[in-house]
Regions:
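Beta-lactamase-like hydrolase cores
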Residues: 24-70, 89-92, 129-134
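Conserved serine DD-peptidase/penicillin-binding transpeptidase domain
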Residues: 87-322, 440
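Solvent-exposed loop/turn segments at secondary-structure junctions
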Residues: 57-59, 69-72, 111-115, 142-145, ...
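Active/ligand-binding-proximal structured segments within catalytic/core domains
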Residues: 71-85
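Short beta-strand scaffold segments in enzyme catalytic cores
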Residues: 51-53, 97-99, 399-400
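Residue-level preference for non-acidic, small/hydrophobic
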Residues: 59, 78-82, 168, 245, ...
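Small-residue-rich helix-loop
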Residues: 62-64, 292-441
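Bacterial Sec-dependent N-terminal signal peptides
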Residues: 1-37
Length: 441
């Protein structure tokens, strides 16, 4: 090796060491300043709080507070579901599996939530069935789970955020009831006869309530408000699926008991990114749960949430620090438990996988602009926070990406559990500290 080469090698080594020491110095200063924000906070001192701030460029945790303690993540769980989708269905969602036998077309569900979804309006699979020219037969039995996820609150069965899970969902698995000229407009039409007046109910608050075990919907004997709009989960069943399909396709759909063969073809439908965005921006629990069944379709003849999660953890999350407890797709279950360090590690994996900030941030709520972060930060056309919120009773979290005035991108997880303060106070304190990071670094 010549003297010149030795000199260059030594210079490069010295330069690398200098950069490393410089980054460490900056990170230590940041850690001290962020820690001061927590120390002076009169809000976070009142409950169980966890925080992690991570630099993806240097792959270093800058600051942590209870970063290895487990928290109930609520809808931050959807970040796990999102990452799994980026890996398992990177382009389009499988809508149906099918085989053709003579004059018959036999099909199986994949869990695809976009079929006749009110927002996504995916009709590709329905057009395929309608135009097939063959006799149609639906083969149920792929889904081997319950209609609710592990650990869900069953008394929320009438609320829009807790639709049932099944293998061939249609129309969000939801009854839509709206006011129209003083009367009720009901969709899907196949369930109109299931909605009736309860003459004995004279409560002032107008609300449609379903019987827990069956599709019997009652509304009170009061005037329908002019702006009334309600979504009520309907009770899923194979018979209802067939009726909804037949009514939509305007042709009969038969029922057949048949195990899906290995050579069953796949009909792909809507682009995955549009489904991820529809899940992440409004925090759609229905889409999140159904996506786990879609992922299960990619690895098994059975549609099973537990098997899908186990596969994803082994194949894509094996390097995640800690031992995350992940039990559903949406975060409705309190059985989910993640640490702030695990959350920023996951965010880093998402960041690396997408490798395109414009594409990634378009699929996430933006602080002050869109989704569940729209009202968490001041209104703006130039958001600096992109991420996911998560809320249950006494739980409010936020994990995502913060862009700083100096042009840096940092990953953060802010987890707040077991508080009795108003959620608005917790939300405002998170915004204050994250905004401080944006402005100072």
């Amino acid at each position: 090796m010549t003297r010149k080469m030795k000199y260059l090698k030594g210079s490069l080594f010295f330069f690398a060491i200098t950069l490393t020491l410089s980054a460490c110095s900056v990170h230590k200063r940041m850690a001290r300043q962020v820690n001061k924000q927590f120390e002076k906070s009169q809000v976070v001192s009142q409950y169980h709080v966890g925080f992690a701030l991570y630099d993806p460029a240097d792959q270093q945790l800058i600051y942590g507070k209870n970063q290895d303690t487990y928290f109930t993540p609520a809808s931050n769980t959807k970040l796990f579901t999102f990452y799994a989708g980026l890996k398992m269905v990177p382009d389009s969602l499988p809508s149906l599996r099918y085989v053709e036998h003579g004059d018959s077309l036999i099909f199986w569900g994949t869990g695809d939530p976009s079929l006749l979804h009110t927002g996504l309006k995916n009709v590709k699979a329905l057009e395929f069935l309608k135009n097939s020219g063959k006799k149609l037969y639906f083969a149920p039995g792929r889904y081997s789970g319950n209609f609710y996820g592990n650990g869900w609150a069953w008394d929320d069965y009438n609320d829009y955020y807790q639709a049932e899970i099944n293998e061939l969902p249609l129309m969000d698995n939801m009854l839509l009831v709206e006011s129209q000229a003083g009367k009720l407009r009901i969709s899907p039409a196949a369930l109109r006869s299931c909605v009736s007046l309860d003459t004995s109910d004279r409560t002032t608050a107008f609300r449609v309530v379903r019987d827990f075990n069956q599709n019997l919907f009652k509304y009170p004997n009061t005037a329908v408000p002019a702006t009334y709009n309600q979504q009520v989960p309907f009770k899923t069943s194979t018979i209802l699926t067939i009726n909804l399909l037949s009514d939509t396709l305007k042709k009969p759909v038969g029922l057949i008991r048949m195990t899906m063969p290995e050579n069953a073809k796949t009909l792909y439908g809507i682009k995955s990114d549009s489904v991820f965005k529809a899940m992440m921006l409004p925090s759609d629990n229905f889409i999140a749960e159904q996506l786990l069944l879609v992922y299960s379709d990619r690895i098994s003849a059975d549609l099973n949430t537990t098997k899908a999660i186990s596969y994803i953890k082994d194949k894509y999350l094996s390097k995640l620090p800690g031992n995350a407890s992940w039990v559903d797709g949406s975060g409705l279950s309190r059985g989910n438990l993640f640490t702030p360090r695990e959350m920023v590690s996951l965010l880093d994996s998402i960041y690396v996988t997408v490798h395109n900030n414009q594409r990634l941030f378009d699929m996430l709520p933006a602080g002050g602009k869109s989704g569940t972060l729209r009202n968490a930060y001041p209104k703006t056309d130039n958001p600096f926070v992109f991420g996911k919120t998560g809320s249950l009773s006494n739980v409010h979290n936020q994990s995502g990406y913060v862009l700083t005035k100096k042009g840096k991108v940092y990953l953060y997880a802010f987890m707040n559990n077991n508080f009795v303060l108003p959620t608005a106070a917790v939300r405002a304190e998170m915004a204050r500290i994250v905004t401080y990071i944006h402005e100072q670094f």
